[in-house]
């Protein structure tokens, strides 16, 4: 058996802009609606990141495949919701997971989110999902 290793991803530092209101964030979001960038927002801070590369996608897809196999074998009636964008004006948060899942029928939002993280810095992802009740 051969063990394959993945190349180290390029380090990408997010751009952070502080002191925005939700309304200002939504205006900036419309202006920056371009392929290749992912915007997140938490507590008045806008984070702009370049879309992840091949290594990130490989790890994401492999982890998702393992999780989906487990959910099938465990008998969950789950729905993959992909990189669904989630936001809450009241919680002052917007986040887009790498992958997400509803673990039972009839749910309005995902129960589980997958984030593949190679670098530190940026917004507190766990706090974002906590506010989104995921």
Where are these regions (language model features)?
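Gly/Pro/Ser/Thr-rich low-complexity, intrinsically disordered segments predominantly at protein N-termini
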Residues: 1-132
């Amino acid at each position: 058996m051969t063990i394959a290793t993945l190349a180290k991803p390029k380090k990408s530092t997010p751009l952070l802009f502080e002191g925005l209101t939700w309304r200002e964030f939504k205006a900036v979001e419309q202006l920056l609606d371009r392929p290749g960038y992912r915007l997140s927002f938490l507590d008045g801070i806008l984070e702009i990141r370049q879309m992840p590369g091949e290594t990130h996608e490989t790890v994401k897809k492999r982890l998702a495949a393992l999780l989906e196999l487990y959910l099938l074998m465990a008998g969950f009636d789950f729905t993959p919701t992909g990189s669904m964008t989630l936001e809450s004006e009241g919680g002052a948060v917007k986040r887009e997971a790498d992958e997400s899942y509803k673990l039972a029928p009839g749910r309005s939002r995902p129960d589980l989110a997958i984030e593949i993280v190679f670098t530190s810095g940026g917004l507190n992802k766990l706090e974002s999902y906590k506010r989104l009740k995921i």
